[in-house]
């Protein structure tokens, strides 16, 4: 069975302000889906070159669709932080921009009603979301993605602050990076220290990779 992802023009944010950390759709930007697909294709192929398995198989840019592996995708987000930002600062009363070395890793349950709570390995297994060892394997993949992504963005004069990925697994339990790798999943700083929204960041990256 073939599976395809459609990249739409919707963007997350609230009150007309675009924010990759938001869980609500804040508007639509013409052409965003196509740009997101071009960027995702670029980064998925980069991950594969670095030995990180992804669900990406092929892409049709004109149609805005990506052909992907059919996988089981648990309702989790794997989060890596190189600096404090966003919800972490609100949760723990921390100033923005404090560095983490090594990076800070979190796993959250995708549940808007509960506010995407943090979840442990034990709870993931208790709820039947993950099998034994998959939590730690997911964190290992997250760290490896972070290293590749951080270096690639640094070459574009962008400093990676934090990002989140989703991970799926096949019938044998092998794990893959899924969904997308676009400015919708990360925060970055430019050379001026400004954090561009995901629309501006996408255009910045598109100009670099084309």
Can you say where each PLM-predicted feature lies in the sequence?
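Active-site loop/lid in soluble adenylation, ligation, and acyl-transfer enzymes
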Residues: 1-109
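Phosphate-binding core of ATP-grasp and ATP-grasp-like enzymes
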Residues: 98-115, 146-159, 182-186
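Short histidine-centered catalytic/ligand-binding loop motif
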Residues: 20-34, 118-141
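A short glycine-rich, hydrophobically flanked beta-strand micro-motif that places a catalytic Asp/Glu
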Residues: 55-61, 153-169
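Conserved metal-phosphate-binding beta-hairpin within the catalytic cores
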Residues: 80, 160-180
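An exposed, glycine/acidic-rich loop-and-rim segment of catalytic or binding clefts
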Residues: 98, 102-117, 122-130, 197-201
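C-terminal helix-cap and adjacent tail motif
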Residues: 181-210
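A long amphipathic alpha-helix within ATP-dependent nucleotide-binding catalytic cores
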Residues: 129-161
């Amino acid at each position: 069975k073939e599976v395809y992802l459609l990249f739409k023009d919707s963007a997350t944010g609230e009150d007309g302000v675009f924010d990759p950390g938001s869980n609500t759709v804040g508007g639509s930007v013409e052409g965003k889906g196509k740009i997101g697909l071009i960027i995702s294709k670029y980064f998925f192929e980069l991950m594969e070159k670095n030995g990180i398995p992804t669900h990406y198989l092929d892409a049709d840019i004109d149609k805005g669709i990506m052909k992907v592996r059919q996988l089981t995708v648990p309702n989790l987000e794997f989060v890596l932080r190189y600096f404090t930002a966003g919800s972490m600062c609100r949760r723990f009363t921390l100033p923005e921009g404090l560095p983490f070395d090594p990076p800070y890793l979190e796993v959250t349950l995708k549940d808007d009603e509960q506010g995407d709570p943090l979840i442990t390995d034990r709870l993931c297994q208790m709820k039947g979301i993950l099998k034994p060892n998959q939590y730690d394997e997911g964190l290992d993949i997250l760290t490896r993605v972070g290293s590749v992504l951080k270096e690639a963005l640094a070459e574009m004069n962008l400093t990676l602050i934090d990002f989140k990925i989703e991970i799926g697994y096949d019938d044998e339990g092998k794990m893959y990076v899924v969904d997308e790798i676009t400015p919708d999943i990360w925060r970055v700083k430019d050379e001026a220290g400004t954090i561009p929204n995901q629309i501006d960041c996408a255009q910045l990256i598109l100009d670099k990779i084309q």
